[in-house]
Each structure stands twice: as structure tokens, then as C-alpha cells.
Amino acid sequence: NLPESSFPVNANSAVRISTKVSEPEDFFPVAEFRKQSAILIGCQNQIHLMPKLYGDIAKAIGNRVPLFGVVGSETQALRGAELIRSIGLPPHAMRFLVIPSNSIWIRDYAPFILRYDDDRALMVDAKYHTRRMREDRKQDDFMGFELARSLGLTVRSIPLVLEGGNFISNGDGLLLTSSKTLSVNKEGHFTHKQLITMFN
């Protein structure tokens, strides 16, 4: 008998590879203080309510890195483009992605974008929910798939509840989080030992 992880998989096969222990890969979350390839911010209807804030962000970044604003409709995207034009910046100073969402808290529900050593990227999309939601925030939960499709990136789903605002990476293998990450995932029927194993 071959170990489970040795079974071949092809497009015509219903067999899936299952590994007992996850194998390390060479990707890592980029540290926030390192040079970024792009910046993604939630705008939604706030682009209309607080235009000066978004204009100031675009000016401060000054085309040093691509800036993307996530909006929920074409109307919001057009308002954003008009804002950028009205403050004298070129159209590419801030581009707008139309991706439906339920809230502005994009740092919490956006996927983690990881970089391989050879500069390829992929997205890791965790579960996302608040204390009282699943239905109320369904668009937020699926935002990662829409973003991956828009940018043409691979996306991997993981069965953990992770909020991006609850993580920070040093970009070199150290990822810090709070005890909240463990407690919400224990509610999802993971044991403490399973969670510690996943994070080590």
C-alpha cells in the first residue's frame, strides 16, 4: 500500500492528495514595513462621504506603488475616478475595483496575499465572520474569490477564521496574533492542540 500522500492525481481522476503533515513552501506574508507591490484599501460609499481622506492618501502615496480602492458599484468607481481627476492626479494614481461587500473593514476580510521567493503571488482566503453573522456578511466572506478572479491570482481556502486586523508579520517567518484567533477557532470545533500545530 502506498501512503495516502503518494496517490497520483490527474484531471480525470476523482482521487485527491491528502497529506498527513503539511509540507513547508517558500511563500511568506510580506511585512507591512517592507516595500509593497500594491496597496488595497476599502472605499465603498466612503469615497463619496470622505473624499478628502482618499485624495490625501493618493497624494501621499504619489504613484510610488499602485493604489487600489475597493468599491461596491460602478457609480462609486466613477465618483472615485472623478475625485482623483479633480485633485489633479493622473487616473492611475488610484484605480478602483468593483467588488460587492457588506462593510468597509477590508483589512479583516480581504485575503492574505503571499509572495514566493521568485516574486509569484497567491492569495490565502480564510473564513470570515463576526459574532452575529454569516448571512449578514456573506459578500465580505466571498470577497477574496472575487478579488482573486479580478487580479488573475490563485486562491487557497483555509478552514480557519482569521481576521487580517488581528495579524502582523515580520516577513521572515514570524506571524503574531492574539488569543482571539485561538478562541474563535475553538468554537469551530478545533482543539487547542490542533490549532497550535497549525500555527507552528
What is the role of each PLM region?
Residues 2-200:
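The feature marks the mature, well-folded catalytic cores of soluble enzymes
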